[in-house]
């Protein structure tokens, strides 16, 4: 009984509260706010998320805000406890290779060994399993459009039917921007190689082992792996758990918040306490009524 009273007294103290909060942040969940529109369609600017820190193992604990590791990376994989790897199509929170303190959220398009094409039509995926299993694509992507390049079958937009928030602009602006960068000698600003494939200009990349090709659902308004490269497992942080609060921001185009200040900082009640899957159900329901 005395021990329990001591534990209660410690937990009730300022020091105990700080220790408990840090332990939760280190090993269970951490709060983030989405500032940009790269995942619009699924996650919006102003969505405030709890991120599940144990989805892909336990990352090396870091002190919040200053992102200072509290212990060495003994395994050199960014994780205290190694776990599952992100699967294709999952939404993942990570630190991109060109940053040290910023957290991004994108959808994992491809895993190590996969080949990716970005064309004027959109993204194509060649899963590495199909190199040894000729029926792999037919089994796993039965209704998808496919195209043959270099003697290999690639799947067009493999996650778009399952995840309705994924979308492109009509003229695929990002493809033309990348083409312009590549032809003007600015290849250092993109991670994919511009090649001619069967008379068509395409961007190509093969994903390294234990790396992941992360793309925003808002395909034409996203800084992602097309530009700064694939993400190593050591940079993987976790997965979105649920939206605990959501506000419209100045850049909320759907509400014309930039031109109408009264539309800023409005609560999006319908998004609160929804997981990514829950938000996608709302999208499917809205699409069915239009």
Swiss-Prot record:
The chain crosses the membrane at residues 14-34. The keyword Transmembrane helix applies. Residues 35-290 are extracellular. The gene is lepB. It catalyses: Cleavage of hydrophobic, N-terminal signal or leader sequences from secreted and periplasmic proteins. GO terms for cellular component: plasma membrane. It comes from Helicobacter pylori (strain ATCC 700392 / 26695) (Campylobacter pylori). It is an enzyme of class 3 (hydrolase). Belongs to the peptidase S26 family. This is Signal peptidase I. Residues 1-13 are cytoplasmic. One of its GO terms (biological process) is signal peptide processing. The lineage of its organism: Bacteria, Pseudomonadati, Campylobacterota, Epsilonproteobacteria, Campylobacterales. It is a single-pass type II membrane protein.
